[in-house]
Design a protein with these regions (language model features):
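Central cavity-lining transmembrane alpha-helices of secondary-active solute carriers
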Residues: 71-85, 135-139, 326-338
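Helix-breaking motifs and short loop linkers at transmembrane-helix boundaries and internal kinks
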Residues: 60, 92, 113-119, 181, ...
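Membrane-interface helix termini in secondary transporters
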Residues: 54, 85-86, 90, 175, ...
């Protein structure tokens, strides 16, 4: 029986085509809550990149511990986000979402009060687990409470906010670090607390409660296998990002891939699987996730390594480096609503083709200008171009993913896309980081000494003037190689968008087709 979630936390039957859409007056609160929760999650995922030097100084963390502080959050988020999304489908999106917000807020306090590198790593791991309950629920709630004819615009605002807050993380971090003293890095985490409390109150008071999928059990075995598989893959990539491409990393990666294969086979045998295999029969769904992997792999590398390049190769301040993301942020914000409306009327194919091409041009421009180009005349315009590309890409990407899945699978669909996004971030740090490191080493002149133990983005102690100049130039060469690779990935994403996405909505105002009936890949 179709259900409609309504104000006052009541669920009433409905015969509408958009069975779960709540009254128009209540939808804005769903969207506000989803955006706020996503904001703290995505800021937390990117802000630490700028704060890492201050954290290392404050806690005495070595380089390996700093990598775990950065990647531990993403590792657990990637491992648990698919089960977290499916859990919302089973138990009710609002309740699981609220638990995730509460846990995320509590672990933010833990991070801010950590007294050792090990304590902060543990807190970041716990925060990743909390985020796995919160992040997929934000998008699933929008899909559940908005009719399909209006979802493109709503998801456009949500996805733009996600991109904006990811990009705004370094800006926020730079401002906090510039304004505070040695312990200012703690406020990078503690700023989440009041936002988390306010969001939790909004969810409990104004977001409609949904009943979940009644009469069906939870696929705990499938969830455990998925978590183990994604966790092993994420762990392997994390070791690679630390320069530890050893037998342990290889074994973990192979074991994770084997478990992913076993997970697919296991889910095919279940009558009510956590991750319905038929979702991937949709060309739109599978293509959107492949596009996510390619585009966000390039974007993740740029966003993670650009601050390092500007600080270490150019000697720019943290506050100025944070400001480099402002053009991207403003342009994405201005494009969210019109692009979402365009997708509602005309489908996602054109934005998901043109957007990645524009992003590729921006990546190429950054590759050529970030190491030595003018900050105001080259780097900021390139970031504005990147904002245009991502502003065209982000809203239709999320709309395509959620439109290809039935409402009762919204959490699982969101979980899959978020898992792909997190894995792409880990691949960016690990894979593109290895590429940048190789280019960095190759760019160091043979007659320069003192840089044997100084890796890409690291500072050397007591370097000669020649060695310091060589280090800075080599960092620029490393980022240039990374940017060229990111541009190539974005062009591949554009090709995927053209080949897999619909050029027009199936039927204006109508439900999207079930995956089983969608055109197969």
């Amino acid at each position: 029986m179709d259900q409609t979630a309504c104000a006052g936390n009541v669920v009433r039957p409905s015969g509408k085509a958009d069975g779960h859409a709540c009254p128009e007056a209540d939808r804005k609160w769903v969207l506000v809550a989803a955006i706020l929760a996503s904001a703290v999650a995505f800021i937390d995922g990117s802000v630490v990149a700028v704060a890492i030097p201050a954290i290392r100084a404050g806690l005495g963390a070595d380089f390996g511990q700093a990598q775990w502080i950065m990647n531990g959050y993403v590792l657990l988020l990637a491992a648990l986000i698919l089960p977290g999304g499916a859990l919302g489908d089973r138990l009710g999106q609002r309740d699981v979402f609220a638990v995730g917000i509460l846990a995320f807020t509590a672990t933010s306090v833990w991070c801010g009060l950590a007294q050792s590198p090990e304590g902060l790593i543990a807190a970041r791991l716990a925060k990743g687990a909390a985020g796995a309950l919160m992040v997929p629920g934000s998008l699933a709630l929008i899909a559940r409470n908005y009719p399909k004819a209006e979802r493109g615009r709503a998801i456009g605002l949500w996805s733009a906010a996600a991109g904006l807050t990811t990009a705004a993380g370094p800006l926020v971090g730079g401002a906090v670090l510039a304004a505070g003293g040695e312990a200012a890095w703690r406020w990078v985490f503690l700023l989440n607390v009041p936002v988390g409390i306010a969001t939790l109150g909004l969810v409990m008071l104004r977001v409609p409660r949904d009943p979940g999928r009644e009469g069906q059990g939870i696929d705990w075995q499938g969830g455990a296998v998925a978590a183990a598989a994604l966790g092993l893959v994420a762990y392997a990539l994390t070791r690679w990002s630390q320069g530890q491409g050893d037998a342990v990393a290889v074994a973990a990666g192979l074991a994770g891939l084997a478990l992913l294969g076993g997970f697919v086979l296991y889910e095919r045998q279940r009558d009510d699987p956590m991750m319905p295999p038929e979702l991937f029969a949709s060309r739109v769904f599978s293509g959107a996730n492949l596009l996510t992997l390619l585009l966000y792999l390039g974007l993740g590398g740029i966003l993670f390594y650009l601050p390092t390049t500007l600080i270490e190769a150019r000697g720019l301040s943290e506050a100025l480096v944070g400001a480099v993301f402002v053009p991207m942020t403003l342009i994405m914000a201005s494009m969210a609503r019109p692009v979402g409306g365009f997708v509602d009327r005309h489908g996602p194919r054109w934005p998901l083709t043109i957007g990645p091409v524009v992003a590729a041009a921006a990546f190429l421009a950054l590759a050529l200008t970030a190491p030595s180009g003018g900050f105001w005349t080259a780097i900021l315009p390139a970031m504005a171009l990147l904002g245009l590309g991502m502003g065209l890409s982000a809203p239709p990407l999320s709309t395509a993913v959620m439109g290809a899945a039935p409402d009762e699978r919204a959490g699982a669909a969101s979980g899959v896309n978020n898992a792909v996004s997190r894995v792409s971030q880990l691949l960016a740090v690990a894979g593109l980081g290895v590429l940048a490191g190789l280019a960095y080493r190759a760019a160091i002149p043979a007659d320069v000494s003192g840089l044997d133990g100084v890796g890409f983005g690291e500072r050397g102690e007591g370097l000669s003037e020649a060695a310091e100049a060589a280090r800075r130039a080599a960092i620029g060469a490393g980022f240039r190689a990374l940017g060229l690779a990111a541009a190539g990935l974005a062009l591949l994403a554009a090709l995927v968008g053209w080949l897999t996405q619909e050029g027009a909505p199936t039927r204006e105002g109508a439900d999207a087709p079930d995956p089983a009936n969608a055109r197969s890949a």
